[in-house]
Amino acid sequence: MPALEVRGLKKSFGSLVVLKDISLSIQEGEVVSVIGPSGSGKSTLARCICRLEEIDKGEVLLRGERIDNGKHSNRDIALLVGMIFQQFNLFPHLSVMENITLSPIRILDVPPPEAKERALSLLKRVGMIDKKDARPSELSGGQCQRVAIARALAMNPRILLFDEPTSALDPELVGEVLEVIADLAGTGMTMMIITHEMLFAKDVSDRVLFMDEGGIVEQGPPSELFTAPKMPRTRLFLQRMLATVGKELIQAP
């Protein structure tokens, strides 16, 4: 049974069609990266999966159960899906520790001592234990994103969705966040990563999806999609990316 399955998903904003009949599945423990130009529908797809956007048509199933039909509460969704956003979305008036423990205590009814113990373990995992009492304003963008990842993990979700987690970061801070995500990938966490970091997607993914104009144009193992794409649109996109990341992108491992 797939960890995540999307069937015939369609989404429009007024007359603008954003997602056109999207179907995909992600297996337990699989890491899938979603690449493509800006405006291709990648972020909207993630928001529809975790029900931040209502879909117009189609189905979204997590571990075989539909979550698009209104029968599941936000608490149910939080138990299944964790989402990491571009802008961190940390509460500015709360400490790092409070940001991580708030949802487990309020939504999952986890006793505060247990929530704090779990938070300390996660902060150690993402290299932020020394900042547990800091406010977000005292942290760099990379540090805020690592806290956001720990916060998502604190809910013990079945799958993590990353919506361009490094796009708002200073280039010098990107590596520290990618290192944390790569570590999670190595633990068998099921993940869908929307990213413009092509080399990272090539290295960490089991499978890569290329999206354009609201549809999935091509998908496959990174060793195939990056080195021998079948579709002309995929080839054009990757050729343009070569100017940024160089020949390393298309070299076979």
Language-model regions, residue ranges each:
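ABC-family P-loop ATPase nucleotide-binding domain
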Residues: 1-10, 245-253
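ABC family nucleotide-binding domain
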Residues: 2-222
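C-terminal boundary and immediately downstream tail of ABC-type ATPase nucleotide-binding domains
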Residues: 212, 223-253
